[in-house]
């Protein structure tokens, strides 16, 4: 079966042959013989061949292509026929009729390329001709892009590309055709560079010899004499020409296309020849492999180029004055004669595309190409077999053609080449963009050389042009360069960034705004490259001799983000974008670290050394780039593939390894180079500390450089002082510094090294140059560019002499002697001046080569120098000036600067470090956060666009996240402070705040951000807390906070909560409540509110504001404070504490609100409260103790202290300190304390109910009971504390009130784990502070007065708070405790009694530590409740309106404002004022019921304790023995019980027996009777019973003699009668032990005295009848017991007691003896204990000497011992004067009997009445009694007391 492809070819043959035959030329002749026409003959032959085969593959591609190619080459064919042949060829390629694997394919492709690029046809009209050109483009594109195109040679590809360029740049062609050519070029360039990774680098020698063949013409067609494309074999004209040239010329339309295209205008206007040559030379010069050539100027033309030019035979090449690619040739214009000659020669038949001019104007080129040996037969058929036979087989194209194309594209971008039009430059930039996007160009060293030099230079020059399209395209190419290969372009990148900064900052009005915008866009784009910013910092800011690019750019961008006019433009936002890029990348890295902590830890375990890590990262980065480029390539090629079966990218992919794989391989090779580290670093990734050192050193170097540039010695000296240069000066070191530092003034270097004092330094300086292999002029050029040559001849001589010596030693002394060398060097300098100095050129004709040779004749040791060397030197100097630094300007200077840049890039200084993403983020952030936050703040403030505002907020949040990640508190504080300004909360007045805030969306965003950041990153917040708290305070003032934040706990309020936002009281102006309410609603002044109510807009704004604050959730700051780091927590507390009283800004409610927040925070942090306790405690101390008057804040402080105690007592580690802190309340002024008694009483009750089990220490119990006493009964706090509080008033608050009780022998202070910061107290307005320390001295001098260790350890727990010394005198024989009770509140007393009841009734809460305290407190409460507390109420005067709940939460309005609080606490002294109308509001109707309940409760409690005391003490003693615990030994004997329990309790009960209220009095008497007759008291001995009489019964009887209840006379009579009966009963019941007392007579006489008093006390007969009967009973019992009989009396005479008794009785019952004993005669007395009268009379009248426990008693009132007025005078006198009389009219002293500390308590027991032989039962009275409200001060009734027994316990303290 015949191959279908054969039919396709046959069809195409028929079409073309038919067209040839139909041509007008054939119409006038008979059909020609095909044998005579070569074209038809070829087709005929092909037909025969095709008919003889069945498969197309059986014949070579050349066979079926040749006829078509001959048609294309034929000069005689018309355009349409040529077009048909081109269409056929294109079809063959598109249909893949050519087998890529066929061995003849290469030859066929080469012939096809040659034919199409040299297509010739007879032109008709321009439109038809352009159709043919379009088809040529199409064939060339298809040829290169299909798989068979890979067989093309380097030369063919260059031909194809150049053909396309000619069409593209020919302005006479239509735009459509030129654009088609442009698109074709794009596809071709993309294909070629996509295939770049497949090609291998060729040996340099191969590159050097082959490049000459492949140079595409860089100039226009007129420059044929300069750039000659290599000629192919001659092409003779066709043999069978029908028409002579002459006949064709006259034809009007006979001009061929060539004539049309070349009439006086060149096809291509491209860069000049020297430009191309020098660009190629430079690429070789800067190649990293040629170190020796690095020091050559990049503008020198290499020998290779010069040779090439000579071979090209161009006379102009040696006469051009170009000194570099930027200079223009002297003669670039085409010779007119040459132009006309060309036109004539080519008029008949010309090539349509490639080489119109070269063949006519240039001699044959001798540099052979692959095709130079081809033979072309007369028909134009080329035969290449001969060359293959000779061993020159066709080589597929590779790197050489790509390099040549790349060089050509770069040459197109030279803005200084006048041949390069704007369109050409743009085209070059566009194709370079495609090339860089398609391939990893940096891996190709041959291309890299071109990039480093010419390409970068042209691009930077283009940044200065005013054409925006070129400027933009240049920026695009620059981005691609520095994105992918910045590691090779360190100093180029530095120059680029500097140029961009210059463009942004320049104030030139001609500079378009768009250029600045694009420059900023370019920076933003670069900054978004991962790690780019970090690399800027590492490679430039941390390089001694580079600019601080990152720092400078950051400053520039920050400054540029602030609009001068106030209006935001794109440039401002772009600057912000750039700054945010750093923030974004850093934040992303931080997020990744946070999210992948575990993964990173695993990586660390298996991590490699740092340099390997860097390499791998770079490799990964490169691979990533390759992948990205690959994707871009694919996408682009998809778009460009058009209808072809096989697009360019498919062709590139065909038969090659994956691009990524190749690139990775290349990168892995390049990585070896990356491991080189810059000399300034100790390792590849230096740590931040090292970078800081480098930066510091860099600053010093810059300063030293500046000083050197002014005075070299001064600069060197400065660097030596700073340790950067050694002392003494090291010449080698200084020379190296002079060479390395580009900032040094070249003139100063010249002067310094040429100084005759520095000869050694000059030698060292010269030795830093490497002159090996360099010609003298080249070495001199290098030498003289390093410094400015001074003008003095001796100095020049010295410098040149050193140079020539070094050059000779480096090059083996090539000249005769050093003088010859010196002369030549001098001659070169003179030549340079002669050729390039403008002044010299004006006066003289420049020296010629011959003159130069003549000048040096015979100088080389009498001989001549080699003429070739002199010629080379002459041309080198003539063509390129030796630039004297800082002498030239303009282009010459630019060339010099560029050569220096290239030179630096080739040294180790040019190493560019690539770093992994995330490295040095902290360093970068530290440098950028300030400018960034400032810019963000400005943009946020000025912008109204939502997107920009959100961008700014996002930036704020990211900055916050980074600062939190790295723990940068100062950054976060700055950010919060900045944001707080935008919340509008601090600037607005309170009246307008809800409206203004509610209607400001930007303020909402700022507020939400502030609170969100505080919630999320509060850990690192420090100073910012203050701003946040100020904002919250503003919200509080404006009543915008949630209800939960303004409601606080309260002990007294029935709901348990009150609001901190109190109602306003009506002002003095008489404003009505309605107006006040309206004013409050509108949040405006009374003037406005009285006119109109709140507007709808204001209401809506307030609603929006409330919603916003709800979303902010400020309460979360409190609830989540438990998660804050300790330091942040302390700062938060410090911010809250700082809102305290000062002159200006103080507001009581603000302070109360802050206090409540502080307390809530402390409670939230109770797990670590020890760390912050001192702060809060000292703050509470300040608020409470310093308060001079009561105010709301003081009340909240007191409540807060109690709340803390209630919550924190459960925590063992802090409970002691908390309880000690309650003593703050005792330090308050009594007047202030009494005003908060309600709160304290209720708070203490709550505390004891919830935490009694957690109180263990006696000191703690002492604190609580003292508080109960002060609050419940108005007892003044212990004097020691009050004295201390007064003394510390100017300097309170900084003391530790916990030191006293913790001052033990081995435990000086409590460890709080946290030392209070002095700043906590700086706002308190006190001058000096004494801060805590652990020293004893500090303890003693602290707020709690430590009197002495012994005082603390030995004092009674009841005293509790270190009694003052000396102690005031206390009467032990009074029923009261002897304290001065101040005013107290009955409700408070009732609550305190409840608290006491709770303790007493629960056996678990009564402990040895608190028993005595409890008893003492009971007695104090008894005294306070006497007569219903009338004494206290009288003292209080009018009750405070504070006690009224109605006024408790009202506040006085500030004048002129309804909303504002008064600013000073004095305006707020109370929650309300005094009011007569409401005087009794604090004493409700049930007051008397309440007071009665209090007294009854106290009675019950005392009786309970009394009955339980014995069992309680027994159990404690047993427990102590069982546990063998240490501490104070607990005794359960009767003496202890009496002294500590029974006696004080009986005194308390007896005290209530003196109550003015009859019910209380009678009930108390009943309790007293039960108590005295209880079974446990039978254990008491005689002394204790005597004490009972002296301390309980006698004071009771004394008190009852007073007129307690004047209104209830009968009741008082009954009371007195019951009391006297009780006295008699107790006396008789315990008569037996009492008789053993040595003081019995005194006791008995005292009883008689009371009988006397009582008998005359009442007005009724009740007592006058009852007393004698009681007395008779006692006398009879005593007489029966023979007490009145003297033991030693003779004859049974009566004893002295008998005499004394009747002396006393006779005073008031003179007839009783007769009545009782008239029939009785006293018998001999029974034996009794000897009681002598002397003993009675003398021993016990005075206290025992030296007994410290006995204190003198108060005076005895005279009426106690006096008889009634009717008594005989003599009797009275006897009584008074008798030494044994128990009573005396004159005052006398007595000593108390021994007693221990006060009593305690225990559960109730069943009363068991006793039966005693001496007991006489007296029925109890039950008569109603009316009480007298007076209180009588008790006095001791008896002056006679016994001395204590030796075994009695010595009292340790008094009951106070």
UniProtKB/Swiss-Prot annotation:
Coiled-coil annotated spans: none
Record annotation: effect of changing residue 130 to A: Disrupts DCB:DCB domain and DCB:HUS domain interaction
Membrane topology type: Peripheral membrane protein
Disulphide-bridged cysteine pairs: none
UniProt xrefs under CDD domains: Sec7
Composition-biased stretches (Basic residues): 227-241
UniProt modified residues of type Phosphoserine: 349, 352, 1296, 1316, 1318, 1333, 1475, 1781
Residue ranges of the region described as Interaction with RAB1B: 1-378
Record region (HUS (homology upstream of Sec7)): 528-548
Biological process (GO), any one: vesicle-mediated transport
Biased composition regions of type Polar residues, renumbered to the chain: 316-328, 615-625, 1295-1308
InterPro entries linked to this entry: ARM-type_fold, GBF1-like_TPR, Mon2/Sec7/BIG1-like_HUS, Sec7_C_sf, Sec7_dom, Sec7_dom_sf
SUPFAM superfamilies from the UniProt entry: ARM repeat, Sec7 domain
Quaternary structure (record): Can form homodimers and probably homotetramers. Interacts with COPG1; the interaction is independent on ARF1 activation. Interacts with ARF1, ARF3, ARF4 and ARF5. Interacts with RAB1B (GTP-bound form); required for GBF1 membrane association. Interacts with GGA1, GGA2 and GGA3. Interacts with USO1. Interacts (via SEC7 domain) with PNPLA2 (via C-terminus); the interaction is direct. Can form homodimers and probably homotetramers. Interacts with COPG1; the interaction is independent on ARF1 activation. Interacts with ARF1, ARF3, ARF4 and ARF5.
Protein name in the entry: Golgi-specific brefeldin A-resistance guanine nucleotide exchange factor 1
Organism: Cricetulus griseus (Chinese hamster)
